[in-house]
């Protein structure tokens, strides 16, 4: 819940100046109130994502938005399962999976977020947590992996200034690909994009992206 219309516009203008790598898919996730505005000013090389949506098409869910509404204004992406939705709003794995399933069924592409808390990392439960969260998504995604990006975002590294070291991030991504190979398919493990999110800056982005399993 950050930014305003001017800040969003400034970000878009910066991206427009580019040049953007044609091999990189650029997606901006913006607050719902700015979705239509940003969709109207981005060039065709940049996509727009909602930061959340609900699990049904319509109904008495005041304050929520649906995949159909997101599609209606021309956006094609949604971020689901963000750690703040999980920790602050109490969204559990099964609810995130329901949202992912409905979004995919309605033609949206999904950035599905997973990640452990500091307590879970210090207890040595990082893999247990991210595997559990990903396992919940498998039935929701089915054969739709081409429209899904996984985002590994350790909760303790979001907005705190703390960052998982590039090697720590790589280790989790590699373990996740191995798990996907056994529990989804080797093709999914090799092809799915797994991003890292958590206090990423211009200074550390290049080092993070140099690792083979970090997209």
Swiss-Prot record:
Active site: 82, 153
Catalytic activity: D-glyceraldehyde 3-phosphate = dihydroxyacetone phosphate
GO CC list: cytosol
GO MF annotation terms: triose-phosphate isomerase activity
UniProt KW keywords: Gluconeogenesis, Glycolysis, Isomerase
Enzyme class, UniProt record, top EC level: isomerase
Source organism, top-level taxon: Eukaryota
Keyword Translocase: no
Organism: Heliothis virescens (Tobacco budworm moth)
GO biological process annotation, one example: gluconeogenesis
Pathway terms, separated by semicolons: Carbohydrate biosynthesis; gluconeogenesis; Carbohydrate degradation; glycolysis; D-glyceraldehyde 3-phosphate from glycerone phosphate: step 1/1
NCBIfam families in the cross-refs: tim
Pfam families hit by this protein: TIM
Segment forming the signal sequence: none
EC number: 5.3.1.1
Protein encoded by which gene: Tpi
Identification of the protein by name: Triosephosphate isomerase
Assembly behavior: Homodimer.
């Amino acid at each position: 819940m950050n930014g305003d219309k001017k800040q969003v516009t400034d970000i878009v203008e910066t991206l427009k100046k580019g040049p953007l790598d044609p091999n990189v898919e650029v997606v901006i996730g913006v607050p719902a109130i700015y979705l239509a505005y940003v969709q109207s000013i981005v060039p065709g090389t940049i996509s727009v994502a909602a930061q959340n949506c609900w699990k049904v098409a319509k109904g008495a869910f005041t304050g929520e938005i649906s995949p159909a509404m997101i599609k209606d204004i021309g956006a094609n992406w949604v971020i689901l399962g963000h750690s703040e939705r999980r920790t602050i709003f109490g969204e559990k794995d099964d609810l995130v999976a329901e949202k992912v399933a409905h979004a995919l069924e309605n033609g949206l592409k999904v950035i599905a977020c997973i990640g452990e808390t500091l307590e879970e990392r210090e207890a040595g439960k990082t893999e247990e947590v991210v595997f559990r969260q990903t396992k919940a998504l498998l039935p929701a995604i089915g054969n739709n992996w081409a429209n899904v990006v996984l985002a590994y975002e350790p909760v303790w590294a979001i907005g705190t200034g703390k960052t998982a070291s590039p090697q720590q991030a790589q280790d989790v991504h590699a373990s996740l690909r191995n798990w996907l190979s056994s529990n989804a398919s080797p093709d999914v493990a090799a092809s799915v994009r797994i991003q890292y999110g958590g206090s990423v800056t211009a200074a550390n982005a290049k080092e993070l992206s140099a690792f083979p399993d970090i997209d």
